[in-house]
Amino acid sequence: KKSIKKLIEILSTEYKYVSVLGTDCFGKEYTSLRTGTSIKNSNWNERGFVLKVYNGINYSEFSFDYISYDSVENLAEQIKEKIKTYISLFNENEVNHYPVLEEEEIAKFFKDKVDVYPTTVSDKEILNKITNINKNAIVLSDKILDVRAAYNYLHVNKIFMSNKKDLEQSYLWSEGIVQCITTNEEDTRFNYKVFSGLKGVEIIDEMESSIKEVVDTALKALEAKPIIPGMYDVICSPEVSGLIAHEAFGHGVEMDMFLKERAKAKEYIGQHIASPLVTMRDGATSERHMSSYLFDDEGVLGQDTVIIDKGVLKCGISDTLSALKLGEKPTGNGKRESFERKAYSRMTNTFFEKGYCKLEEMIKSIDYGFLLDVPMSGMEDPKSWGIQCMVNFAYEIKDGKLTGKIFSPIVLTGYVPDLLKSISMISDEICLEGSGACGKGYKEYVKVSSGGPYIKARVRLG
């Protein structure tokens, strides 16, 4: 921190805004399959710095992975020379102009706790736990081709410093998966269950308790039939609700897309775009989950943003530069894939708020329809509000009861406002999950979580 402070002081004599984000994130991934086991460094590991400078026109950024107190002056001179080069190119190219960022004076420190830190348990112990899950699942049926059990953790350590800010945070997240692949003479199917949160090795205990459930559903999936395409009343599980929240009004309200005229949501702020039952939030402080932090990658404190309030679209989520250009206050959603990448407007913990209904009531209300569970993937077009979600299973509901019949795979499609306006019942419990990664287009992967309650809606399935 002493070296960073010196670098900021030197550059601040010439530039009106200087900040540095420092990252030191480390973790491991443990996997067990029928064919063997593996331990490797987490794909999320990173260590380095990114410096942001207001160059008089807009902002220049420089990433580096080493700094010492003795080399600070030399580094500062290199940065000054690069800025001069960049500015000389501005006359030849059309560039965006930005005002200087205004900051409040803040000094804060955040350190989270988990029950069992991975570093207090040996690699061998963790791998044995994962391997036992694999072995205990495989012996349950001769129709099981393979079982994948995996545990991944990351210890996130970050600092953010400027002339007015001195921020530091340290927290740990973990994720796990139990996936079962089954086969018979006619077909091959699979099922999985994921586990995630600001937790440690204790998450493996949750994985162990899910073995029978995961295997039973994977075996049942061998009986699954294709669904007859059409419009249906459905109940979405919390995981599928989260997929809809993420795709429908997560990516669609990332405000850097407002600037690029790539998001229809910009035209509908203040308008009814969902059922009055629907309230949707995003924020690092909205829920304690995978994307909960003290500050984002631009030094903005995490917030709780209400995106949809009782059916009305209220606002989007932003990074600092998008907010600056739009004349808005940043929402603490500026996130980088790593210290080497640009900050974009990204989701954190995105979810629908709970309602007042019981799941049993919701099922009883359906004459014919389906309970959708186990999300696979999703895609939304923010420009035209089309949405497509892949879901693994649809459980048949007839005369208010689950029949035991299962259909797979399922494609959910539609126009976002139509889908959200059709929501007629919302359960009184919510659940979030944050395994995997969220991309910006086809790249820029970051950690997020999504979820919600069970929701009843009318959608097109195929």
Segments the model singles out, each with a brief description of its role:
Residues K1-G462:
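N-terminal small-residue-enriched
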